[in-house]
Amino acid sequence: MFTSQDARDSRPDRELRMMNDVLMTYPYTVIHLPAQNMLSTAKGMVNIAENYRDYPILAIFYVKYLMKKLPYGVIPVNLEWPEPYVVLNTILKRLKEHKFFANKDKEDFAERLHKLIAPDVSIPESRKDEILGQQKKERVVTKTINENFLDPVNARPRLQRFFEKLHNGTLVENLEVGLCKVEILVSSKAMLGQSFKLQIMAANVRELWVGEMVCNMITNETDYGFDEGGGDDDEGSSVEVQNSQSASPGQDQEAQRAPEAPETSSQLFDKIVSALQDDPDSAKAQLGQCRKLASYLLSHKREQEDFFMQTKDTRARLYLDLKGCLGSSWKFSIYRGVRCKQNGQLKVSLKPSNSGHLSGFWVNIKMTSQGNTLDDIRLQVRCDILGKDTNRRGGSEKDPEDQSETESSG
């Protein structure tokens, strides 16, 4: 008879789970085709560089790293590959920093892994700390520009003129080297007025925050517990606890006797969105409910697919809302996706077309309220204007906030 102990023994041991985490085995699927010296991914085929031919684990890891970093981007067939030791360093660093090694010999394990996946790759002594995504030497900030567009009087034409100068390069003239940091604050209420459009935009922000948060939880199952400072389960269930405490003893006994009807994904989603609408500051308290929804969708694949598609549609609607507020006649595209913060804010990456001197935009979306009533949706737009010399050498597409803030990507 299959006992509970047999079930425990049949589970992957902690070492295997750790290796799955370190090598990002899930959720990214990359297949090695040794005969063609290529990798097959959901985003197409990728040629493996010659110096990676004998190290397919390194090649697979690098492509998975790019898939995680650029979830909505395109991975070209002919990639620009870093030195193999950089990828190896990254893997070994992830291994050593894994929570599994709280009281274990991580150096010995790292040495064994090195010999297993890349025995002939040597790491130069001066390059032992060089890893993927490492922040390059910061460019000198030679100028900063801050503008607010909060007054509804002439807000739209003022913003339009500002963007025109930003786009054609006349906002900052004679910037030869370094960069200019630009930050503007836009009031959606000033752009849209106290109209139905503002309410629709607020609904899209709430729905997209829930959608992105749940999709991130589903995609990153290993991060399900929010180890990095997220709200805990007690916090997430605080609304239900308060309701239970306020019920009378008779109601409480009746509730215990009555069978609880299972909630569907749409019911759970609507409950979270309604809670955010009733209390705009309750985002962190809803993380527990988001986990509950993610757990449900993990066991209902068809509904999970529909949920991902619904979130994609909401993302497209919010993009139209942003264009309506920013009022720019030049084209944007969502570049590096959307990040959701646990406090309910969203960050959207936008890339303007035909603007090589701009590094791209990050728009931080924050709803403000008076009591429980929506007051405004503030858009904090940040970008870097690259100096002419910097632009010729190729500008960075990183988040302008990354110099002062470390944040998870979802």
From Swiss-Prot:
| Feature: compositional bias, Acidic residues | 225-237, 399-410
Q: Where is the composition biased (Basic and acidic residues)?
A: 388-398
Q: Enumerate the residue ranges of region (Disordered).
A: 225-264, 388-410
Q: Name one GO biological process term.
A: plasmid partitioning
Q: Name one Pfam family in it.
A: Rep_4
> Which keywords does this chain's UniProt record carry?
Plasmid, Plasmid partition
**What's the protein here called?**
Trans-acting factor B
Species assigned in the record: Zygosaccharomyces rouxii
InterPro entries from the entry?
Rep_fungi
Q: What is this protein for, i.e. what is its function?
A: Plasmid partition require REP1, REP2, and a cis-acting DNA sequence (known as STB). REP1 may act by intercalating in the yeast nuclear matrix and binding STB either directly or via REP2.
Gene behind this protein: P
Per UniProt, the ranges with Polar residues bias are 239-253
